[in-house]
């Protein structure tokens, strides 16, 4: 009977870990799972030693304010590992915490195999971490198709198991644009209140430059409709059916993140935006980007494609007039639209529709049996 210990520290990691637990139990029915995570992991059959509500701290200020809680979480995880003595430790994203736990496990439980599912984005920044990941982990299970080649440059191995977003969207029913309703612009302002409050007004103002188009704002799970109300004008719609809204829109304005990839896979031309605080430092950040980051892009669409497919209005370029100008091209330049949609098709081919969690579980269970 295999014992698996999983660590996810954020809501997205909880979601992916839960899918992995389900597959582990299907492929290894007698297995037991414990770890640190959220409600989805618990519902999938994982005994939790700590909940992500006590682990997910966003931003430097939040981390600084919660240093005591973070140290406590390390102690909880370390003691849980020693108590459980699992056959395998499975890490899901959450890099700073998980790399420390990998090091602890390697020293204290040398017989435990370590797997990193959804490894840190070392191809974007903190590239030196690639050596620690390869040294500490028995297998690295990536969700982007370029990751194996990136690791190979350093003499290490990484398995591409599939992309969960592409897998999910391959199952979403396609909804054709309805000629019976006015043409629309979809606004995807993000998933956290802070980023929505920073971005939504400028995103809406850019879309309002085209009054012939209906504006549909896609609400994030867990954020009440009342939060959006002050931003909306008469005739502007709030929806929680994001996938349908995006598929029926002529174009979209999207806050950078997984939503840009979702929008591309749903076939909607888009412009991406991203707010950076501390405006006096924005020019310096842009200048230093090649030194700090290993890639020239912010959005997953452009990173995966290896070139600019969608326009990125980031930092000081995130201005209403620039977003509106790009939106105008998306709405009215048919050649530009077709080129972007063709690039989306190539992107979809690169990602494939591999069942990521099932593939990762198969690798883990096979290695555990060997």
What does each model-identified segment do?
Residues 1-370:
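Nucleotide-activated sugar donor-binding and catalytic core shared by glycosyltransferases
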């Amino acid at each position: 009977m295999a014992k698996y210990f999983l660590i996810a520290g954020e809501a997205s990691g909880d979601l992916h870990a839960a899918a992995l637990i389900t597959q582990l139990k299907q492929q290894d029915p007698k297995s037991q799972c414990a770890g640190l995570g959220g409600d989805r992991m618990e519902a999938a059959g994982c005994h939790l030693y700590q909940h992500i509500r006590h682990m997910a701290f966003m931003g430097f200020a939040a981390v600084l304010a919660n240093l005591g809680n973070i140290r406590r979480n390390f102690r909880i995880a370390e003691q849980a590992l020693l108590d459980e003595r699992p056959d395998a430790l499975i890490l899901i994203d959450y890099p700073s915490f998980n790399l420390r736990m990998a090091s602890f496990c390697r020293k204290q439980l040398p017989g435990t195999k370590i797997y990193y599912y959804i490894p840190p984005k070392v191809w974007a920044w903190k590239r030196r971490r690639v050596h620690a990941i390869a040294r500490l982990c028995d297998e690295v299970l990536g969700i982007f198709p370029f990751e194996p080649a990136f690791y190979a440059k350093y003499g290490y191995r990484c398995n591409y198991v599939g992309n969960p977003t592409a897998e999910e969207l391959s199952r979403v029913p396609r909804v054709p644009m309805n000629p019976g309703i006015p043409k629309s612009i979809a606004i995807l302002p993000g998933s956290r209140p802070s980023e929505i409050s920073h971005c939504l007004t400028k995103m809406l103002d850019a879309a309002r430059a085209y009054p012939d188009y209906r504006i549909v704002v896609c609400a994030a799970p867990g954020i009440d409709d009342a939060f959006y109300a002050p931003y909306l004008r008469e005739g502007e719609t709030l929806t929680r059916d994001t996938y349908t809204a995006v598929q029926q829109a002529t174009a979209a304005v999207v806050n950078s993140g997984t939503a840009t990839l979702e929008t591309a896979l749903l076939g909607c031309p888009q412009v991406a935006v991203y707010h950076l605080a501390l405006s006096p430092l924005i020019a310096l950040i842009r200048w230093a980007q090649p030194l700090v980051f290993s890639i020239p892009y912010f959005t997953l669409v452009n990173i995966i494609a290896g070139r600019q497919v969608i326009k990125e209005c980031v930092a000081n370029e995130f201005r209403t007039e620039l977003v509106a100008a790009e939106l105008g091209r998306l709405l009215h330049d048919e050649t530009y639209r077709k080129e972007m949609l063709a690039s989306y098709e190539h992107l979809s081919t690169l990602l494939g529709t591999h069942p990521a969690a099932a593939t990762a579980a198969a690798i883990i269970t096979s290695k555990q049996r060997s």
